[in-house]
Structure formats: structure tokens, C-alpha cells
Regions:
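Nucleic-acid enzyme cleavage-core boundary/entry regions
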Residues: 1-94, 103-219
Length: 219
């Protein structure tokens, strides 16, 4: 789903995504019927989780920080990736992901970045090569003093998946990404986006995201 500073035409209906409830606009797989009308957004934020979307929607995050927010509610489905690629191409805005600090979150970021291995033949039409990983980074856990009880020990599958990611060419090309995954492997910890709410519900919207965006703290 999608919400924020964007107006579209869906066949004959003009939809202002800023005025929708916390559920946002359900991204249509029939993108040929969608026309991008206007946007004064300054960036696009892609969220792994619906819970984070609801939090940002409740805070009307896009009013203070002009943006378009998308989520595929977990796995990066084709409709969401196609729509992201389309608005990215038409609006030419910076794009960021906010995912859990775990191998699956990093994998989801990689699917938006370059497409999935399973659909490699379609990847050029679905990828957003300029997307940046805003968080949650392993280094953020220390930087923002995330409490230990919000940090989760990695299991064997997590360790295996992290090692697999470190073997990927697209990770090796990005030294900051490689460093963050190596740190996760060294500490053997992971954390969910929700860990940030240890400091209160406003921490994500009022401090974490704005601070990282203003300081360029992404991968």
C-alpha cells in the first residue's frame, strides 16, 4: 500500500494519497491504468512492515517530512516493486528502505535494489538501483543505545543467511553494507524496527528517521 504526498488517477478516479486513512491506497497490479498526476515529495520511503506504516500514518509523517511511503507488508511483491520503479522513474526522488535489522530485512532491501533471483529475467523491469538502506542498521543498535532486551540473538539460519549475503557480488561492491553485515555476524544479534519504540512511539518518526536522513546515515 502507499500513502503520502502523491496524487494519481486510477481510470476515472483522482486519488489524493495524503487524505487517505492509515491503510493508504492499495497498490493496483493494473499499473497501465494509473497516471501519476503530481507530487511535492522530497523522498520515497519503503517500509518492510505494516506496523511501521501504521505508526508513520498515525503521525502524518509526510506532512512534516514531504514524502511518499510504501509497504509491501513483508515480502517485496511484484506490484509494489513495479509501482516503486515507476514513481522513482517519473518523480526522480531519492528512495530509502526501512527494514528489520536481520538477514531477511537485508534480503528484502536487495530485492527492491536488484530484483529477486527467482524472477531474474524480469529484474530489470522491477529493480530500483538507486535505493538506499536507511535502517535498521546493525551499527544503529549501539549508536542509538537500543536496550539489550530488544536485541534478539541470531539463530543458525540467520548466521547462514548473513554469510550467504556476504558472498553476494552486490554486497561485496558496497563496503558499508558488507561492514554492517560483518558486524551483525560478529555480534550475532538482530533487531526489529519495533525495537526503536523502546524509547516511545515518537522516537521512530521524530528522531530516528529524520536524524538519519539529515546526516546521510544510510548504506
Amino acid at each position: 500500500s502507499c500513502i503520502g504526498r502523491l496524487r494519481i488517477r486510477d481510470r476515472n478516479d483522482i486519488i489524493d494519497l495524503e487524505g487517505l486513512g492509515s491503510g493508504g491506497w492499495t497498490i493496483s497490479p493494473m499499473l497501465d491504468n494509473i497516471e501519476i498526476l503530481e507530487s511535492d515529495a522530497e523522498f520515497i520511503l519503503v517500509l518492510e512492515k505494516d506496523a511501521a506504516m501504521i505508526r508513520l500514518a498515525e503521525a502524518r509523517f509526510w506532512r512534516k517530512y514531504p514524502c511518499i511511503i510504501l509497504t509491501a507488508k513483508g515480502a517485496a511483491d511484484i506490484a509494489t516493486r513495479m509501482f516503486l520503479r515507476r514513481i522513482n522513474k517519473e518523480l526522480k526522488l531519492p528512495v530509502f528502505t526501512l527494514v528489520d535489522s536481520d538477514p531477511y530485512g537485508h534480503y528484502i532491501h536487495s530485492v527492491y535494489l536488484r530484483g529477486s533471483k527467482r524472477l531474474s529475467y524480469e529484474s530489470p523491469f522491477l529493480a530500483t538501483p538507486n535505493i538506499k538502506l536507511l535502517g535498521v542498521l546493525t551499527r544503529d543498535l549501539e549508536k542509538y543505545k537500543i536496550p539489550n532486551d530488544c536485541r534478539i540473538p541470531m539463530n543458525q539460519t540467520d548466521i547462514k543467511r548473513t554469510k550467504e549475503l556476504l558472498n553476494e557480488g552486490f554486497v561485496k561492491k558496497n563496503k558499508a553494507w558488507e561492514t554492517d553485515l560483518k558486524l551483525a555476524l560478529k555480534l550475532k544479534i538482530k533487531a526489529e524496527i519495533q525495537a526503536l519504540s523502546a524509547f516511545g512511539f515518537e522516537f521512530l518518526t521524530d528522531q530516528y528517521i529524520p536524524e538519519k536522513l539529515s546526516t546521510g546515515d544510510w548504506i
